[in-house]
Amino acid sequence: MSDRLTVLHTSDFQCGKPYLPEAAEALLELAEDIDPDVVIVSGDLTQRAKKREFVTARSIIDGFGARPVVVTPGNHDVPLYRFWERLFDPFGNWRSFAGERALDTVTMVDGAIIVSLNSAAPLRAIVNGRVDDCQVDFARQAFETGERDALRLLV
């Protein structure tokens, strides 16, 4: 394990209106300047969870290059007004962006265990995220089974 881990943590790209491309460009320039070991993006990549917004978000994520990127959805990454989609496939467009990986993830990076929990709760009021007992157990197990001296980060 290295003595130091550099993390670039960001959120709220809000691709779609009011997305600002120059802010994304500045973020990618910052990543080049500080050369983080890992990038963490904690939600709200989109404004309204539309496919075209996820395409824009993907271009930003791809701009981080070969660095590990931990991404978790936020409340804006599930449809708000498309009720049918929100009820029956709230993470459908998210999966077109992120692939079929789980919504809760464990990432190991240079002596660190990073657990990312999805708190977006599409069937609740849009501003009320939730982490349930199963997710807490998921994080606990990941941390307990990891290297004893590993740094532990929860997103």
Where in the sequence are the language-model features?
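N-terminal active-site segment of His-dependent metallophosphoesterases
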Residues: 1-63
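Charged active-site motifs of nucleotide-sugar-dependent glycosyltransferases
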Residues: 5-6, 38, 113, 150-152
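Active-site neighborhood of phospho(di)ester-bond hydrolases with catalytic His/Asp-centered motifs
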Residues: 10-11, 38-44, 68-75, 118, ...
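Extended active-site neighborhood of metal-dependent phosphoesterases/phosphodiesterases
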Residues: 55-150
